[in-house]
Regions:
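Short, well-formed alpha-helical segments that are part of the catalytic scaffolds
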Residues: 14-31
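A conserved acidic beta->alpha catalytic loop
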Residues: 26, 44-53, 73
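Glycine-rich, basic loop-to-helix element that forms the pyrophosphate-binding segment
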Residues: 71-88
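Short aromatic/hydrophobic "clamp" motif used to bind/position activated sugar donors
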Residues: 93
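Membrane-interface aromatic/basic loop that binds lipid-linked glycans or pyrophosphate carriers
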Residues: 119, 276-345
Length: 345
């Protein structure tokens, strides 16, 4: 590897409101500049706005830092990240969403932690903000102390269950390359598959207990609009996670963890976000969620992680659906109708 760090930035239609500029400015202004040789790999995922023009302008201004990779067709974020991984030269790999930004010392602190501890995976916390600022907003703890240190089987189990966001970490490139790790393409929620799977291959995880990453909350964010297409993408991510874990020999050793993550992603999260967020939900889709989960894990509701982490109300509703899909569907829709009436008063 000829560089210390490769930062991969998937970009799709982020030209408006200075979002892309603010992200790129935070990357070229890193304090590691001059300390380490690093690269910023900007993958334009067939944008239909001026994103590519902005990227090419930054590449012209910072030729020693920025390399633009234009995709001819849209591959979604996972595919864009894969294109960056194909050409990355860094000893370490970092990812950032193109509408977010990072503190000037973000990568310096993560790399320093890696050098001090010998970790091959380093993360931090993040700040929720609704405008461009370096003032800290609501702080979200991304990972916890019991997940850090040398990754024993027990710690791998905890990290698999709650891997945290992938953009808040740097990854030793050799681990990615040697284990053929990449992202699902053509779907939303690619990290739902990649995050847990990747975590099983790293041997030492450390974290910087500071909110060094700024997560920009706005209305066009992937996670803020629920459609059946996006719900199906989450289901697909869960299926891919199951398949990858099975094919890579993890299904026996980490069965309870895989069962829970599959149930959470494919069924529980998707079920309630679908019913709450889609205007005209379909009973057939709700039935599909239950059957798809029971196909792999017929006794998912006895899983210890499910019993521990799934809320009592959600468990009650899912138990109702297991007895009668129609009764559950009618009950939930009526309850939601009543809530909406009260909210409009």
């Amino acid at each position: 590897m000829s560089k210390k760090l490769s930062i991969i930035v998937p970009v799709y239609n982020m030209a408006a409101e200075g979002k892309l500029n603010y992200c790129l400015d935070s990357l070229v202004g890193q304090t590691i500049r001059g300390l380490y040789d690093y690269e910023i790999l900007c993958v334009d995922d067939a944008s239909t706005d001026a994103s590519l023009e902005i990227l090419l302008d930054y590449e012209k201004r910072y030729p020693e830092l920025i390399h633009v990779i234009p995709n001819a067709v849209n591959l979604r974020q996972g595919g864009a990240k894969n294109e960056g991984l194909k050409v990355a030269q860094g000893e370490w790999i970092g990812f950032i969403d193109s509408d977010d930004w990072v503190s000037p010392d973000y990568y310096e602190k993560l790399l320093q932690k890696a050098e001090e501890t010998g970790a091959d995976l380093v993360g931090c916390d993040y700040s929720l903000v609704d405008h461009h600022t370096f003032e800290v907003g609501k702080v979200i703890v991304n990972n916890t102390p019991e997940q850090t240190g040398e990754l024993t089987k027990e710690k791998h189990e905890i990290l698999f269950i709650r891997p945290g966001s992938m953009v808040l970490k740097i990854y030793r490139h050799s681990v990615i390359r040697e284990n053929c790790l990449d992202f699902p393409e053509h779907i939303f929620y690619e990290d739902n598959c990649a995050g847990p799977l990747w975590s099983l291959y790293f041997r030492h995880f450390e974290r910087v207990e500071e909110p060094l990453y700024y997560y920009y909350q706005h209305e066009v964010s992937t996670v803020h609009h629920i459609t059946e297409e996006k719900c199906r993408d989450r289901m697909r991510a869960a299926e891919l996670l199951y398949t990858e874990c099975r094919n890579r020999g993890f299904l026996t050793e980490y069965k309870e963890q895989i069962e829970y993550r599959f149930t959470e992603l494919y069924y529980a999260i998707t079920l309630f976000s679908y019913l709450s967020g889609v205007k005209k939900p379909k009973l057939s889709f709700v039935i599909e969620l239950r059957l798809g989960t029971e196909k792999h894990f017929p006794e998912f509701d006895k899983n210890p992680y499910y019993l521990q982490y799934t809320g009592p109300e959600e468990q009650k509703l899912i138990a109702m659906q297991k007895k009668s899909d129609l009764r559950f569907f009618v009950y939930y829709r009526l309850r939601q109708f009543v809530w909406n009436l009260r909210a409009s008063d």
